[in-house]
């Protein structure tokens, strides 16, 4: 289905049982991809489901007062992906006999990008399950009745949401990604859970201090999660969101937190209390690449100085002007890198008199570098002009002007 019709266009509606793959692309604004009405519509999708909307609703249930119930279930068989671009939404303010939206995402390439809207825990139920590194990019404040966050799944509140309310929470090994401002001790995303089963969930943060560059110090605590059941466990996990730093937050239970005013939190609360920043792998590779390029440049300089040393033993009364060539290859290493290189030099010397020689040279070289977390290739092209003057008592003066360009991948 590919529908570019009027605003409010619906892709698929009614009672549908689809074992095969389903793809819906609603190009009109505020359209609905998959819909069930509370007039007895019951839909089940067990194959691949891909729904794209234009600022619309990927999956929606519409209820009418006094009507029959309705449901949409997306439960793909093993290996099938679910990709939903748009909200998951109950379209009604009426009490109905029951409207259910139940969606399971089971693969690493499965995602929901949108909010969960309209669930109330009574006659409008939304159940969402994320497993096996699937992702929820939460584009707005959301309410979910049953939420499963399991096995490296990611629920990311930094995509436009501020709050997530969950009636029943379960899972272990999943992640929450949250916007925070530890320095303020008030601003940040919030998660409220009514009931939970035992399990460990990781928390990653994008703190405002990463943008401001201001280090957060002192006794700070920012409430992130409230679990009324006191059953779930939350712990900090490092996050590499690009930029310079890996960020590892310290997440502590409220019972172990003493606030700046001397009060303590409660066992149902989970606080961000500290942020540790370390240079991430991407930055480490860049720094090592700079060191490697500098080392290669130094090696070519050393080779040119060696040529100038040869000139000091030249007998200008015998040796004439001429072209010279040199190859230099080998390996070098430093902190965090090692490299093998090949360098070719071609030059011309002009003997002005018995004590003065001038010349120019061009260099071309390459290197293959290995870093702790990556690899790279360097290409160098450089040019030099030089002069050497011999004085009495074996004294000498060398002057070199050198320019060049590195290309590093």
Predicted regions and their residues:
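Outer membrane beta-barrel translocator domains of Type V secretion systems
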Residues: 278-409
């Amino acid at each position: 289905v590919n529908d570019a019709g009027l605003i409010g266009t619906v892709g698929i509606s009614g009672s549908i049982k689809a074992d095969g793959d389903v793809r819906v692309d609603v190009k009109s604004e505020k359209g609905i991809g998959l819909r069930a009405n509370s007039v007895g519509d019951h839909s089940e999708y067990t194959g691949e489901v891909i729904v794209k909307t234009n600022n619309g609703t990927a999956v929606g249930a519409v209820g009418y007062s006094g009507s029959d119930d309705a449901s949409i279930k997306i439960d793909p068989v093993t290996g099938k992906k679910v990709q939903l671009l748009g909200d998951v939404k109950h379209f009604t303010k009426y009490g109905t006999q029951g409207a259910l939206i139940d969606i399971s995402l089971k693969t690493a390439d499965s995602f929901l990008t949108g909010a969960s809207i309209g669930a109330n825990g009574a006659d409008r139920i939304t159940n969402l399950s994320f497993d096996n590194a699937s992702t929820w990019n939460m584009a707005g404040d959301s309410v979910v009745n049953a939420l499963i966050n399991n096995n490296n799944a990611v629920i990311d509140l930094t995509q436009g949401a501020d709050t997530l309310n969950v009636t029943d929470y379960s899972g272990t090994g999943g992640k929450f990604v949250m916007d925070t401002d530890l320095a303020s001790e008030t601003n940040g995303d919030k998660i409220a859970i009514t009931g939970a089963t035992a399990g460990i969930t990781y928390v990653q943060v994008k703190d405002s201090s990463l943008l401001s560059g201001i280090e957060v110090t002192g006794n700070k605590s920012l409430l992130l999660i409230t679990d009324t059941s006191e059953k779930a466990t939350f712990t900090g996990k490092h996050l590499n969101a690009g930029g310079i730093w890996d960020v590892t937050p310290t997440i502590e239970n409220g019972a172990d937190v003493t606030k700046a005013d001397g009060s303590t939190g409660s066992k149902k609360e989970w606080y961000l209390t500290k942020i540790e920043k370390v240079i991430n792998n991407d930055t480490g590779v860049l720094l090592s690449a700079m060191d490697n390029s500098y080392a290669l440049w130094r090696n070519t300089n050393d080779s040119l100085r060696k040529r100038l040393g040869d000139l000091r033993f030249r007998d200008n009364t015998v040796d004439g002007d001429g072209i010279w060539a040199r190859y230099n290859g080998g390996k070098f290493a430093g902190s965090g890198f090692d490299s093998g290189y090949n360098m070719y030099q071609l030059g011309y010397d002009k003997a002005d008199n018995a004590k003065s020689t001038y010349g120019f040279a061009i260099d071309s070289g390459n290197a293959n570098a290995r870093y702790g977390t990556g690899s790279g290739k360097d290409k160098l092209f450089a040019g030099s002009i030089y002069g050497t003057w011999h004085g009495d008592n074996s004294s000498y003066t060398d002057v070199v002007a050198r320019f060049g360009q590195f290309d590093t991948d």
